[in-house]
Amino acid sequence: VIWTVSTDVGRIVVREQLEPDDEPGILELFAACDDWFEAVNGTPSGPGDVQSLFYALPEGTSFDDKRLFTVRDGDKIVGLIDVVLGFPHRTAAAVGLFLVAPSHRGRGLGAAVANVLLAEAREGGIDTVTASAHDTWPQGQTFLRALGFTVGPPAEPSGNRVSGPGEAPVRRATLTLQP
């Protein structure tokens, strides 16, 4: 599925599905977003972070539940969104990563893309969306609250993901989608 989203930075394309040719662009995005990786994980990004996109899943979900979206400005990948459908319950979706390149932050791109994907989720029968909210990345919590999420207390790690050495606790942010 491909969406074209009008934003303050121009027309952005959101694509559901990664291609093998996307890996260099994702590595470049991750390197550009080392501020986020260092704040959240305590270390810069690395090739293992790209690989974990495909393998990190909450308990009780399968690879068929995983959705990875790229956000593109022309040919350049400027964002990545990692979603697991059916978690924490059948009609929910969990956002594990919503990453926007520093060059495109603070200009409405994230909100425009999120609103398109939230509308698609609502139309697809999703009634709850959860997201990870890190105390060490307060702008992420501000973004989630602006979208209408409620940010809860720190939570324990779940699923098959191993926390990094400098990783701070994560809070679950929750948004109830109205039909």
Residue map of PLM features:
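Terminal substrate-recognition subdomain of acyl/acetyltransferases
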Residues: 1-7, 132, 157-179
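Acetyl-CoA-dependent GNAT
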Residues: 2-103, 114-116, 120, 124, ...
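Short, Lys/Arg-rich nucleic-acid/phosphate-binding segment
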Residues: 88, 155-157
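Conserved beta-strand-loop-alpha-helix junction that forms the acyl-donor binding cleft
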Residues: 105, 131-141, 159
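Glycine-rich phosphate-binding loop
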Residues: 108
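Conserved active-site alpha-helix within GNAT-family acetyltransferase domains
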Residues: 111, 135-153
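Conserved GNAT acetyl-CoA-binding A-motif
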Residues: 121-133
